[in-house]
């Protein structure tokens, strides 16, 4: 909504809203991600409540029972992220501005694809979304890794809609032997030393060559504009650094 110039429509946000920085100064925080006060949210008298993912299903149900209008997105791919931008643009009568944004992102993605097409070899990349249990191959990240010039070693799992479908074992990573390990643990810092010290991981190329990197969750784990801009830029710099 900020990118569309429609931020004046926002009456409340979650405490996990981090972009843009001024959002927390401009709008009241009325919920967490999973939990929220139906009373506080309803008191804002919103015309529409927008949420993301099946994880918010219980909160959405409570709000619906309180006679609120609720729209939950569950975008998982780059194409779906772009469609969400268009949908929100239509809702707030800013479709033209939304289309311009989408066009910019698509042009940037296409430029990246053309640039990396010149690479002779694509490094094998392992992305870790969470450590215990270990999850990988969240779809939009898997796609962005490919766009940035890498080869996601678990891309075959990326179409799994549920986290349990993307769970992996540490031995699987050893077998894949990635050249680069990227990690972004939502809600806590990545412990790179613990990754290095996992049984058998000392033989992985990424560990031997010290190519383990943490990525800020706010630019990679949120399937929105940030992942298509800052997230893609960071991925490209880390994957193509050599």
Predicted regions and their residues:
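N-terminal ligand-binding lobe of clamshell/alpha-beta domains
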Residues: 1-242
């Amino acid at each position: 909504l900020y990118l569309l110039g429609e931020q004046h429509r926002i009456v409340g946000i979650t405490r996990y809203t981090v972009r843009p920085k001024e959002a927390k100064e401009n709008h009241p925080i009325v919920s967490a991600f999973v939990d929220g006060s139906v009373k506080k949210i309803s008191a804002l008298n919103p015309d529409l409540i927008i949420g993301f993912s099946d994880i918010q299903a219980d909160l959405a149900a409570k709000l619906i029972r309180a006679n609120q209008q609720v729209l939950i997105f569950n975008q998982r791919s780059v194409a779906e992220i772009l469609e969400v931008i268009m949908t929100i643009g239509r809702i707030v009568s800013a479709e033209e501005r939304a289309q311009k944004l989408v066009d910019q992102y698509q042009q940037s993605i296409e430029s990246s694809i053309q640039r990396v097409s010149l690479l002779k070899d694509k490094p094998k990349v392992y992305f870790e979304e969470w450590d215990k249990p270990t999850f990988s191959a969240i779809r939009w990240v898997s796609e962005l890794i490919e766009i940035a010039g890498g080869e996601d070693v678990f891309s075959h799992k990326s179409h799994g809609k549920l986290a349990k479908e993307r769970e992996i074992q540490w031995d699987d990573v050893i077998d894949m032997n990635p050249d680069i390990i990227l990690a972004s643990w939502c809600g806590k810092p990545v412990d790179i030393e613990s990754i290095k010290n996992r049984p058998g991981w000392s033989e992985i190329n990424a560990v031997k060559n010290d190519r383990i990197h943490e990525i800020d969750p706010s630019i990679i784990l949120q399937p929105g504009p940030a992942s298509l801009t800052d997230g893609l830029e960071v991925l490209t710099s880390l994957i193509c650094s050599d």
